[in-house]
Each structure stands twice: as C-alpha cells, then as structure tokens.
From Swiss-Prot:
GO terms for cellular component: cytosol; succinate-CoA ligase complex. Belongs to the succinate/malate CoA ligase beta subunit family. Its cofactor is Mg(2+). Pathway: Carbohydrate metabolism; tricarboxylic acid cycle; succinate from succinyl-CoA (ligase route): step 1/1. This is Succinate--CoA ligase [ADP-forming] subunit beta. Substrate binds at residues 265, 322-324.
Length: 388
C-alpha cells in the first residue's frame, strides 16, 4: 500500500525527520489560504498521486501569489495526472500539497531503503545525486550509490549512519543531524512495516540544515492487519478498480495492457502462462492467480474481473489440479460463462486432479469453450482466436 507525499511526511515527522512544511488543500480556495498561511514569497503546489514523475508531467508548480496557487490547484484537482509511472489514464488528483519554498539549496542528496530479498534485511541506499530518479543513477553512475545493510538483531548503529554522512560530504553539525534523521527513518521503517522508503531530494539548505523535500513510502500490505492507523490512510481512488475488487475475494490480480485475459492457479504457472502467450505473439491483459485452494465462487468472480476489462478479446484458463479439482473449476467456468454472458473466445487447459472429468463437463455444457491439450496448444489457440 502506497502513501501520499503528505501522509509520508506526517508519518516521518513523528520520528524526528525534518520535513518540508506543507498544507493540504482539496480546492482552489484552500490552496490560496495555504499560500497565505505559509507566509513566503513563493510556494510549491504538488499534486497528490501515487506515482513518480509528477514534475515532468506538470504536477509540481512554483507559484508566486495566492491567486496563482488557486489557479494551479483548480487546474490539477479533479483531473487525472499521467506520468511515466502511470497507465494512459493516469491517476486522479483529489488534493494538492502547498509547500514552503526551500530553494535555492546548496545540494540535493538521496536517501532510501528497501527490504533486500537476497540478504533478507533492510538495506539503505544513499547518493550525492539527489533530485533525479535513482534508477538513472544506478544505470549511469552506479558507483555513486552507497549501500548499508542493517542487522535486524542490533538495528541501525550510529557508526553506520556516520559513515553514510561522511560519504555524502556532510560536515560538523550536519553529521549529527543526519545520524538522527537516518536512525529515525530506520525506526519508522521497522515499526510501520515499510516495503519502500525514499527521500528524494534530501536538501542541504543554505544555512546548512537538512530537509526532506519529498518523501515516498510504501507499506507491506501483508502487515496492515496490525497497523490499523496506517491502514486507515489507504486511498482506494489511486488503485486499479479491478485490482481493488480482486483483493476483496483474495485474488491476486494485476492489470496489464494486452488483450488476452488469463486465469491461472499458482503464481509461477501464471507467469509461465503469460510468458508463453508473449512467445506466441500475444499480449496478456492481466496476471490473475486464483490460488491453490480456489473455490467455485472465487473462480466466478475471477471471470467477472477479467471480462470487466474492455480490452480483453479472449480468455485463457490454465488450471493444474492439485489441491483444487479440475471438475470443480469446470463447473465454475460453466456457471461464470452463463452468468456473465461471455462473447469472447475462451480456451481452457485442465491438467491434474479430475482433469478428464472436468474436460467432459466442459464438452457436455454446450457452451463455446475450446479445450487445449497442453500449455503450448492453449497459447497457440488463444492467440489465433484473438487475431494477435
């Protein structure tokens, strides 16, 4: 689950991080009032969406008056912002953050942290190249990224934070300030089950003070059950409608941009199914794992989810019966096709537990369902059916 910038800053401020002052506004009048309240000659109006690249997309504007703040807010709020991290529809802007102007600054740094799957530990990343996408730095000048792995038994130690501060060229009081900042960030990361944390840029102001100008936080969704206060920050308007619906039925669904809907049991098999569709010249419209213990109801809902996507021109169902029985899946497919009134080609491949019985049920249903013998055959048939 992602947080908005204003939510991330409010959370990090509780752990002592020096964040840029800002006021949330949900309309033009509130934006104008926020400009007055900040009391500066300039302010920065930032669209609040769950996506990076806002500046290049016109979602971050410097304003010089309350009228200009109101105009920018009116332009952004109620619209969708399209960035390189969104799809063609973009993300809805429901509010803007009116922030104090902190520029010019002496330098822009980067500080971030993730859970490194290879070490299974929190790993901090820091760089002198702040203000740009860290992916660009990693690609062009990877030597400029410093990594620090934290031992979970002892936590982040002061000497580790000091080493990072020195590597970033910080001096005197800045070192102690950075140690407090990084230590607070680690506490926030662990106590709130972060999956991702970024301060970009971490500004060194003209007076030498550090300030978090932007903040990005992603929460591990599996931990939300024990984080009620954080879970309450969820903004469902920023999530894909079908993905949101899928979560209600414990379906693992990710929307893609192709035209072949996929329903598979098991994440590994789902990825293999998408791979072979691509290999045969098709484009998957989604990743959908109904799980090893799929029920009839979940399969019906999965079918509805797939067909709710107007770009879907055909559906490939690939089921390996282990825990789940293929005849039960077949019954669910038949019920779903009848209930949803499917008009696109549907190719079904069943293997494993009661596969023959399942295939017979599909054949005797009288519905226009195409059976496939093997994954290769299934992919070829669905790609041919949609004319990919």
């Amino acid at each position: 689950m992602n947080l908005h910038e204003y939510q991330a800053k409010e959370l990090l401020a509780k752990y002592g991080l020096p964040v840029q002052q800002g006021i949330l506004a949900s309309n033009a009048d509130e934006a104008a009032a926020a400009f007055d309240q900040l009391g500066g000659k300039f302010a920065v109006v930032k669209a609040q969406v769950h996506a990076g690249g806002r500046g290049k997309a016109g979602g971050v504007k410097v304003v010089k008056s309350r009228e200009e703040a109101a105009d920018v807010a009116a332009t952004l709020i109620g619209k969708n912002l399209v960035t390189y991290q969104t799809d063609a529809n973009g993300q809805p802007v429901n509010s803007v953050l009116v922030c104090e102007d902190m520029y010019p600054v002496e330098r822009e740094l980067y500080l971030g942290a993730v859970v490194d799957r290879s070490t299974r530990r929190v790993t901090f990343m820091a760089s002198t190249e702040g203000g740009v996408e860290i992916e660009e730095v990693a690609h062009n000048t990877p030597e400029k990224i410093l990594k620090v792995t934290v031992d979970p038994l002892v936590g982040l130690l002061p000497f580790q934070a000091r080493e990072v501060a020195f590597a970033l060229g910080l001096k005197d009081k800045q070192v102690n300030e950075f140690v407090k900042l990084m230590t607070g960030a680690y506490r926030a990361f662990v106590e709130n089950d972060f999956a991702l944390f970024e301060i970009n840029p971490l500004a060194v102001r003209a007076n030498g003070a550090l300030a978090c100008v932007d903040a990005k936080v992603g929460i591990d969704s599996n931990a939300l059950y024990r984080l009620p206060a954080v879970a309450a920050l969820r903004d469902k308007s920023q999530e894909n409608e079908r993905e949101l619906k899928a979560s209600e039925f414990d379906l693992n669904y990710v929307a893609l941009e192709g035209n072949i809907g996929c329903m598979v049991n098991g994440a590994g098999l789902a990825m293999a199914t998408m791979d072979i569709i691509k290999l045969k010249g098709g484009q998957p419209a989604n990743f959908l794992d109904v799980g090893g213990g799929a029920t009839k109801e979940r399969v019906v809902e999965a079918f509805k989810l797939i067909l709710a996507d107007p770009s879907v021109k055909g559906v490939l169902i690939n089921i390996f019966g282990g825990i789940v029985r293929c005849d039960m899946i077949a019954e669910a497919i038949i019920a779903a096709v009848k209930e949803v009134n499917v008009t696109v080609p549907v190719v079904v491949r069943l293997e494993g537990n009661n596969a023959e019985l399942g295939a017979r049920l599909l054949e005797e249903s009288g519905l226009k369902l195409t059976s496939a013998q093997g994954l290769n055959d299934a992919a070829e048939k669905i790609v041919a059916a949609v004319g990919a």
